[in-house]
């Protein structure tokens, strides 16, 4: 697999990032927090989202205020080019391949694309064999158990472990099936006995069915004759009962009709009496009709007249008052015009006084700005003048101390190089002395055991002295570097010092400028100007108010004309109403009121009698309707009387033809025969059902007997399969251990070479030993094996890195891509330089390597350098030149 290009949009600090990768070593470099590791996380999300990686959640990587995360990965696998695109926010995804001319879609949708990628390169293979993550070195150094877990994941030994466990599950499943079959065979041991018992029961049931079947036709024939005679008697009894009920009903109807006839005759008499009374009332009503009409006409006029006069009187009073008020306001306007002229003259004088103060006001404004600026500058000055001078002296002292420290560190580095060279020579001499025979490889004379021992002791003592001096140098270097950090902190304050000095100079300049102004005089001028402005504003407000009122003068005159017109119209309306009163023959309202009082009794009697006409009409209609009802009821009584006579004759005839005793006798005989027949039929049905059940049970038992034979054969096969599965489990376990030991032996050899490079051959090898659920790691020093506790902190990190690189290099024949995320944490400067040589020597065996780091030294080993920086909160990617 080879990664060609990665496009990232709105992922953490990346707004829109495009990264191109090539064959060889690709280095992604940048400071912590610049977004370089986010490129690797985006690659994982692009390939395996949504279920992998599990520790990445959508909210963790979506860019704030972004339009939505999108990732596109272009890569090659098996000489075929692919691209995977994911739009996380919208839940869209696709994978395409290039057929040589254009891109063709393979899958769409987040889950289908993830499943396709999982088949092409399983996530566990990518994460364990291809991707060396931050913190994985710590897991290698943490314990023998955690180291074994890393080895198991990277080498893919989990597959064999899972196979071993899965085979145990298979064996358990086979055991469960064996037990189930054995239980089944035991539970069906008596099947032949059950078949014999059911065959006997079937013979007995068939015999009883043959005895009952002939009796049923005879009983059914006898019962049919009785039921026919019984049916005829029941029909006669039913007709008799129906005739009696109908007769009783008709007799009741006849009584009701007679009662209705009497009621209607009584109502006719009462209605005729009311009709005569109402005719007299209608005559009186007609005699009062003329007076009633006059009363209604005069009453309407009186109501309209009084309402109109009252309304006019009220409006006349209102409009008269308005006219008086308007005339007074118009008279006041001339006084206000004179007042406006006085105020304008006063305003002109104030404006002249304010103009004379203009220059002083401008000077006062400039002085205020200088004072405000001085206040701001003093707030920015965080140190006093004495403290600034003290800080300047500290920085000068720190600059001198830094030169001294750098010079001493250079001397320490030079001395360490000399000691390493001597130690290398002594180690080489020791190795040669241990292997040498005959002549001494040091001096060339004959090599005796005494001479060998003497030289070995001498060189070993020298190596111990060198080691002690190296530790002292390392201790001194550590102390100097710690001091250098503090010195650098002081030197970083130099920029702050420059800024403070500049602020101090600005304060002095501002104070000098302020001395040029007479602030007391300028403040008095400003106060006077404010007072004048206040007076001027008051005058302008009063002038505007008066001018607005003067403008309203014409409107007031127009309004007065309208009010006077309205008063004339109201007077005319009042005169018109009085004219109508005279036309009716009345001199004033009192005469009209007296005439109404005179007509009122006749009008009230008229109102009282007015409903009589309608009542007379209703009563006459009712009388007519009652007479029609009476005629109809008389006809119905005659008809019902005839029906009652006919029904009485029909009942007498039916009573003569019906024999009640014979009816009861037939009921008893029919019931007895029906019960006997039902009992035999029920018994026959029960026997037939039992016959069918026994036959079905026999069929099932015979099938069960055949099944028993098949199960017995299956049991033998399962027992043999269990033995084969157990043998296969043992083989899988043995092969896993063999593979693990062989792989760790090769990994140990490669780790030894890398570790020797990292420690400049201080250690002559790395030991790797596999145990149950453990992998022990050690080093060889001066021919002896030591545990990890023998190593310094930096050497432990170097060993962990060497071991993890060896694991990936072991798989180099199977993988074409390796990713390292921050491989240099805790490595000192010298070991980082050694790592560059290791990358050039070993990692070039892998077609494509992607390294993420903040160490500039790694650039020397890279074929392509991609620099990541954070600018205004956004990650920016640039390709850098390779030296």
Swiss-Prot record:
Chain positions recorded as ATP binding sites? 12, 32-38, 134, 790-795
This chain belongs to which protein, by name?
Answer: DNA double-strand break repair Rad50 ATPase
Keyword ATP-binding included in the entry's annotation: yes
Q: Which metal ions or organic cofactors does this protein require, according to UniProt?
A: Zn(2+)
The alphabetized UniProt keywords are: ATP-binding, Coiled coil, DNA damage, DNA repair, Hydrolase, Metal-binding, Nucleotide-binding, Zinc
Q: Which positions, given as ranges, span the membrane?
A: none
Q: Where is the Zinc-hook domain?
A: 395-492
Which GO terms of the cellular component aspect does the record hold? DNA repair complex
Q: Which family does it belong to?
A: Belongs to the SMC family. RAD50 subfamily.
